[in-house]
Every structure is written in structure tokens, then in C-alpha cells.
């Protein structure tokens, strides 16, 4: 009894909520064996036939290719595509592909040569001696993807499963009406399918392997049981026919009773699912060394004279397959890629067969029925009762129609598997799946835009942070440079510290003065004189710096000198015409003489700092020196011939002496700055200087006599 209960629990199956039972219409195509289709003249191979980015091209126009030769390189999640036959690459250009909107994707166009030559094939019959990583890499590089309709790269899926997979499920349900590709494949190639399952099991090492198949496929069930007769590691589970029991989440629940969490994957609960066609492709890739270049496609519908299942090369135009099956189109003929519930209408018949193409349905007008007009939702809740994902399709319909993306996301529109059960039972003929597909596409576009905005914001904030760091570092460097004293300041600080230490040392030593002697203040006096000399030197340095910063214009200096000479002549005339009884204040005369000397010194300094390119003409300087000497002689004669009682004005004498000294200094500087080839006679200059000194001495003596 215990064994009976254990066996019952082991073979237990669960049932999911919702689902429908549409007419199966499978007998049109599942009664004939698989057959080959003649090669087309031209093949169009899209670079992207899977979920993920397209691979990198490794062929160019004009190249000769063989069947199975890679057309792209598969790196990361990029899955390569291979040439379906031998021929020549005639173009690499965008071409409309299997998409409801007939979007153009980059494709390789090959003209077949009719020979259908393979590349050298290297099969791994002893695959059990290979490592897990080698097998996964081979499956990936041979272009194997999920052939059940999703198109997810099989190698990536196996790699992501890792060691946490406890249950491997092989999906053989094939629940959608009209489609019999997997059914016929299991009938004709059951042994190869089981061998592919064993390869997957060798890679994943699961605890149990389950094959889920609906009870409407008796021939396939018989063939699998015959192959698995001596196997105890693979369990065949026959489940009731119900749509959509072939969905990944639905079949997982039917066989294990586990539900995939919202927003999660089946691997999160230790389950990995593969399609029957995928298992067969894995066997051919690993054991036979053949990349995926063809797949089983169901050709069905009353508009096809010879329905059945064929081996269709990837890239074959749909028109070629239909014509080979006796396609008899009617007016406004519709061709559906996929099933009647989850498929889509082809915009034209030149689109190619890709890896996810499992059925081409060409229904007649009787099968389609009269077109029904879309009406308003009556909120009957029939769609909610039929939904296998436990969603509220009527609410999602209103949210999708009203562009309420947040509410649609809150109501888990992402969990919709687009099975079409809600649209099938809707009495108002509302194409709910179309609304849901459009809404999910808009939400995906919004999220992509938000992602780009977030990345742009992150880049901007990183840039701002970098600028702030650079600014802070720059301010810190400036602050450190400002705090650090300069070399001159260091010397001054060191000298001050030395003086302080010296004073402290002197203060600690007692000063002893003997009786009758004066204290020795020579050190203090010398220090005071040194400080005064240092102050004068600093003052002179500062004055030179200021004068160098504001160099006087030589022409302006000459004008000022002329004005000074004019003022001196005017002063002489006024003094000569003054009344004899008017007495001049000697202190005022001394002040004026000092002012004249200061102006003369300033004039000398400005001339010394004048620009070198504006040198004074040495001939002009010599003329002025001669004029000065003549004036000095004339002054001597006047003084000698003057009457004894005539009193000489001391102010005039002082001014003349100052002017004479200024002229003498100016003459010396002009001679020093003159060009080498125009040097003035040094003897003449010495004579002029001596005359000037004599005149100054005479003026001083005369001043003393007058004061007496």
C-alpha cells in the first residue's frame, strides 16, 4: 500500500487555473512523415534570430560559403548564425524579417550553388568525456537556441542554471491548435530526441528528468515509451489536453506543483525547461557536429493542398515553402506565422524562415469565418476566468487603452504570456493581446529612456564630483603655498630668531662695570646703525622697484628739466631786480636749495631708469656741458668785477650751486650712458667737474661772508 501511495504521489500532476479548449485541428498535418523541401535559389539569413544582440559579421560580399559555415561570431550572449547551404554571399543589407511590422534587420543574402556542400564536421560521440564548459561552448557556437518560440540562447540558459537545477523538464506539450512540428519530430526521431535529453542531463546533473506531453499525441507517446523502455532516469508524464498547458510556467506547475515567482525565472525554484526541438538540435550539434541550419516547420491550413511537416532550411523564403506544398491563395489570403492564437499575420511572403518559426498557417475563408467588429467591453469577466496567469485582462485593457502605464505595471502586465485565451473567449471581439503587446512595448521604451536618463545623470554627477575634487585640491595647494614662507622671509625670520637668542643670551649674562668707567655701548650702537642701514637699503630697494614699475618717459623728463631751468632763470632775474634794502631769509634759501637738489636727484634717477633704446645724444650733452662751463666763467668774471659794497644774494648763490651740481651729475650720467663710439673726452669732463666744485665752494664762502 505504501508503494502504491508513493507511486501515485510520484506521478501526480497538478492543474492550473483558467485555460480553454479550442478545436485542435492537428490531424491536417500530423499524419504524414517529415519530408525535405527542394533548395531555394536565394536564402536570406537575418543576423538576429534569438533574444539578445546580433553577432559580429565574419563574411563579406563575394565570399564563397559552405553549409554550416559561421556567418557571424558568437561572443557573450550573441548567438552566431550559419550558412544553410553552400553558395555565394551576394549582399549584406537590411531585409524584412518575421515580425508583425515587417521590420528590416541586417541580413546575409546567399545565392545557392545547388551542391549543398557541408563544412568538415567533427562530432563528439564520446561527449561524456568532455567537460561541462566544453559542451556548453560547443552548443553556443553551433547556434542552438530555444526552438519552442522564445529563441533564448541554449548555451546561456545552461550556463545560468549552474548547479542549482534539480528538475529538467522537456516540453513536448505543443498545445496550440494546428501546430504538429514537435509531434511529428517525436514520431520520426524519438531516439535522437532522447539522446539530446541525455546530453542536457549530463551537463546539468539534475535529480529528475520529466517529459511533459499532452494526451492528444498517442503515436508520439508510443514512440517515446518504446525508446525509454529500459531507462529509469527519464520519466514520461502524459497530461490532459488544455490550452495553454505548453506555457513554461503552466507546465512547470502541472508537473511539479511549484509556481515561478513573480518577476523571477524557473531556475529560481530549481527547474530548467527545454523544448523537444531544442533537445534534437543539441544532439546534432554535439554528436554529429552539425550547426543548426534547418528545423521542422508545419505547413497547414485549408489553403494548402499538401499540408504536413517539412525540414525547412533557415533563411528559406516563406513563399518557396508554400509553393512547394501546393499553396492556393484566395482573395485577401492571410498567412500566419505561428499558431492561430499566438501567431501573427505576415505582411508579405518574402520574409525568411528563422529559428523560432514552427508553423505557417494558410487558412481558408471558411476557417477564418466572418470578420467580427470590435465592440465595447461589457465587463463579463470571461477573460479573467480564462487567463492562465491569474491576471485581470479587462483592467489591463482599460489601462492599456488609457495609457496608464503605472497601473498596468502594478497589475502585472509583464506576467502576461500573450496566449490569446482572453481574446478567444471575449464576446465583444476585442483583440486584447494586441493591446497588451503594444502596452508592454511602450513600457519597455519608457524604461529604456529612464535607464538612459539615469546613466546620463550618473555621468553628470560623476563629472561634477570630479570637478569639485579638483577644485578642492587646487585650493589646498594654493593654501599650502600661501602658508609656506618664501626664501627671503625665511632668512629674515632666521635673522630675527638669531637676534632674539643673542639678546636672551646677553640678558642672562650679568654686566659688570668697574668704578669710574663708562659702559661699553659700542655693540648697541653698531646694531642700531646696522638696522638703520638695513632700513635705508630696503627703502632704496622699494623706491627702485616703484620707479622701475613706472618708468618715466625720457621726453617728459627733458620737458621737466627745461621747466626747472626756466624757473631758475626767472628767479635770478627777480633777485637781480629786487630792492637793495630787501633782506632774504637764509632759512628759506636753504629750503629752496634742498628742494632743487631733490629735484636734481629725481631727474638723475629717472634718466638712469629710462629705456635703453632712447639714449641721449652725446654731442648734445657735450654742447650743454660747454654752455655750463661758459656760464661758470661768466659768473666768475661778474663776481671779480663786482663792486665791494655790492652784496651777493645768498639764495641766488645756493640755487646756482645746486643747478651747477645737478648739471654736473647729469653730465656724468650722460657720459656713462653714451655709445662707445661717441665717448666724450674724459679730461674735459674732469675739468668741468672741477670748475663746478670750485664754483660751489666759492658760493659757500660768499654765503659765510654775507652772514658775518
UniProtKB/Swiss-Prot annotation:
The lineage of its organism: Bacteria, Pseudomonadati, Pseudomonadota, Gammaproteobacteria, Enterobacterales. Keywords: 4Fe-4S, Cell inner membrane, Cell membrane, Electron transport, Iron, Iron-sulfur, Membrane, Metal-binding, Repeat, Translocase, Transport. Residues 630-682 are annotated as: Disordered. It is an enzyme of class 7 (translocase). Part of a membrane-bound complex that couples electron transfer with translocation of ions across the membrane. Required to maintain the reduced state of SoxR. It comes from Escherichia coli O45:K1 (strain S88 / ExPEC). It comes from the Bacteria. Its EC number is 7.-.-.-. This is Ion-translocating oxidoreductase complex subunit C. Pfam families: Complex1_51K (PF01512), Fer4_7 (PF12838), RnfC_N (PF13375), SLBB (PF10531).
Amino acid at each position: 500500500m505504501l508503494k502504491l501511495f508513493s507511486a501515485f504521489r510520484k506521478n501526480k500532476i497538478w492543474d492550473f487555473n483558467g485555460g480553454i479548449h479550442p478545436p485542435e485541428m492537428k490531424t491536417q498535418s500530423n499524419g504524414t512523415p517529415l519530408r525535405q523541401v527542394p533548395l531555394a535559389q536565394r536564402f536570406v539569413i537575418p543576423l538576429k534570430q534569438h533574444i539578445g544582440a546580433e553577432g559580429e559579421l565574419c563574411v563579406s560580399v563575394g565570399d564563397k560559403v559552405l553549409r554550416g559555415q559561421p556567418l557571424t561570431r558568437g561572443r557573450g550572449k550573441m548567438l552566431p548564425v550559419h550558412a544553410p547551404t553552400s553558395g555565394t554571399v551576394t549582399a549584406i543589407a537590411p531585409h524584412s524579417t518575421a515580425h508583425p511590422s515587417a521590420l528590416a534587420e541586417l541580413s546575409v543574402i546567399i545565392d545557392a550553388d545547388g551542391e549543398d556542400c557541408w563544412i568538415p564536421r567533427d562530432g563528439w560521440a564520446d561527449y561524456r568525456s568532455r567537460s561541462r564548459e566544453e559542451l556548453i561552448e560547443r552548443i553556443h557556437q553551433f547556434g542552438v537556441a530555444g526552438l519552442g518560440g522564445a529563441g533564448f540562447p541554449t548555451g546561456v540558459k545552461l550556463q545560468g542554471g549552474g548547479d542549482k537545477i534539480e528538475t529538467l523538464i522537456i516540453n513536448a506539450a505543443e498545445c496550440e491548435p494546428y501546430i504538429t512540428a514537435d509531434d511529428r519530430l517525436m514520431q520520426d526521431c524519438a531516439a535522437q530526441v532522447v539522446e539530446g535529453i541525455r546530453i542536457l542531463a549530463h551537463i546539468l546533473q539534475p535529480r529528475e528528468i520529466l517529459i511533459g506531453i499532452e494526451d492528444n499525441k498517442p503515436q508520439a507517446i508510443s514512440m517515446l515509451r518504446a525508446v525509454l523502455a529500459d531507462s529509469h532516469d527519464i520519466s514520461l508524464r502524459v497530461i490532459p489536453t488544455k490550452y495553454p498547458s505548453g506555457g513554461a510556467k503552466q507546465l512547470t506547475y502541472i508537473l511539479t506543483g511549484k509556481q515561478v515567482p513573480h518577476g523571477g525565472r524557473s531556475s529560481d525554484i530549481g527547474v530548467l525547461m527545454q523544448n523537444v526541438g531544442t533537445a534534437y538540435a543539441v544532439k546534432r550539434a554535439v554528436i554529429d557536429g552539425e550547426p543548426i541550419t534547418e528545423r521542422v516547420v508545419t505547413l497547414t491550413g485549408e489553403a494548402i493542398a499538401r499540408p504536413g511537416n517539412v525540414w525547412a532550411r533557415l533563411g528559406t523564403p516563406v513563399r518557396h515553402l508554400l509553393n512547394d506544398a501546393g499553396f492556393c491563395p484566395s482573395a485577401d489570403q492571410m498567412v500566419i506565422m505561428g499558431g492561430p492564437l499566438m501567431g501573427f499575420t505576415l505582411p508579405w511572403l518574402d520574409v525568411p524562415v528563422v529559428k523560432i518559426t514552427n508553423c505557417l498557417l494558410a487558412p481558408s475563408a471558411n476557417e477564418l469565418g466572418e470578420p467580427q467588429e470590435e465592440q465595447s467591453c461589457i465587463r463579463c469577466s470571461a477573460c479573467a476566468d480564462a487567463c492562465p496567469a491569474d491576471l485581470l485582462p479587462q483592467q489591463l485593457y482599460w489601462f492599456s487603452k488609457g495609457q496608464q502605464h503605472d497601473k498596468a505595471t502594478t497589475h502585472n502586465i509583464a506576467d502576461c504570456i500573450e496566449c490569446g485565451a482572453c481574446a478567444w473567449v471575449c464576446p465583444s471581439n476585442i483583440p486584447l493581446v494586441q493591446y497588451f503587446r503594444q502596452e508592454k512595448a511602450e513600457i519597455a521604451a519608457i524604461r529604456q529612456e529612464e535607464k538612459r536618463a539615469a546613466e546620463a545623470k550618473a555621468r553628470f554627477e560623476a563629472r561634477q564630483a570630479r570637478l569639485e575634487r579638483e577644485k578642492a585640491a587646487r585650493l589646498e595647494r594654493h593654501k599650502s603655498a600661501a602658508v609656506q614662507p618664501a626664501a627671503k622671509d625665511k632668512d629674515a625670520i632666521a635673522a630675527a630668531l638669531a637676534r632674539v637668542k643673542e639678546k636672551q643670551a646677553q640678558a642672562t649674562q650679568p654686566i659688570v662695570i668697574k668704578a669710574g668707567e663708562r659702559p661699553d655701548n659700542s655693540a648697541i650702537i653698531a646694531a642700531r646703525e646696522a638696522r638703520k642701514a638695513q632700513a635705508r637699503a630696503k627703502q632704496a630697494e622699494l623706491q627702485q622697484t616703484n620707479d622701475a614699475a613706472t618708468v618715466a618717459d625720457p621726453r617728459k623728463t627733458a620737458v621737466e628739466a627745461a621747466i626747472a631751468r626756466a624757473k631758475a632763470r626767472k628767479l635770478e632775474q627777480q633777485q637781480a631786480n629786487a630792492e637793495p634794502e630787501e633782506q632774504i631769509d637764509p632759512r628759506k634759501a636753504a629750503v629752496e636749495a634742498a628742494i632743487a637738489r631733490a629735484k636734481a636727484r629725481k631727474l638723475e634717477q629717472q634718466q638712469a631708469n629710462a629705456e635703453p633704446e632712447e639714449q641721449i645724444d652725446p654731442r648734445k650733452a657735450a654742447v650743454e656741458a660747454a654752455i655750463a662751463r661758459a656760464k661758470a666763467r661768466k659768473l666768475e668774471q661778474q663776481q671779480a668785477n663786482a663792486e665791494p659794497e655790492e652784496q651777493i644774494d645768498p639764495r641766488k648763490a645756493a640755487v646756482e650751486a645746486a643747478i651747477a651740481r645737478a648739471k654736473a651729475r647729469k653730465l656724468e650720467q650722460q657720459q656713462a650712458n653714451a655709445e662707445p663710439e661717441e665717448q666724450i673726452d674724459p679730461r674735459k669732463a674732469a675739468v668741468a667737474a672741477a670748475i663746478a666744485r670750485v664754483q660751489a665752494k666759492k658760493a659757500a664762502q660768499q654765503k659765510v661772508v654775507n652772514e658775518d
